[in-house]
């Protein structure tokens, strides 16, 4: 749908702002005096060209034929450090011996019903690539269902542009810089929580969801979280990027809003967080009951 298919040239201004968050700018790769003499001076056409490149076009003229609107021979980037993970029907354990086990929590909160409702769920393979895309691939026939470019990985994409490659590789072929992007291995877990509805609103009560965590690995100190309960209608929950160059943490929420959290000086501990305080209270309460 158009709601999902949003990495397009019509959204170039919004996508270009993602570059600015990480202090990258697009270089003027194509203009009247370079390579094939295509494009115009300035970077407006190159921002759109980079977007089209991510969608499979040969904007950097890999084959040297000066046709930058054709689909290039190899579209998918390398899957290097990212391990593949397959997600099909829910399969978490429901057998428990003690009430402090995770299996007891699942049984108590009707995980069996979640299992039944998703028994026939499409089996999907998820893998991160260094072209900047998390790929969702049908385990049945190998076709790609969709691709997701995390917002803070999108901010890194101008790095692939190298004007020195314009017409100077192998005689007259173009090229681009290889980078690390979505280089970490996805992690999947079924979580009982108040999820996000397709409308963008938060559920009024908790339910089971299949959550996919996407670390960027060598692509940068960040990660994205998707709800893939319905693998054909994924939902972006949030993304976090630790920008240690500018001493801040960037957070993108489920509505696409990006906020900046500056580093605070001083000492902090997880025990001081709301979750840490609650965990300590639960521990002390359980200890008193044992005594």
Q: Where do the language-model regions lie?
A:
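A fold-level detector for beta-propeller and closely related beta-sheet-rich head/sensor domains
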Residues: 1-291
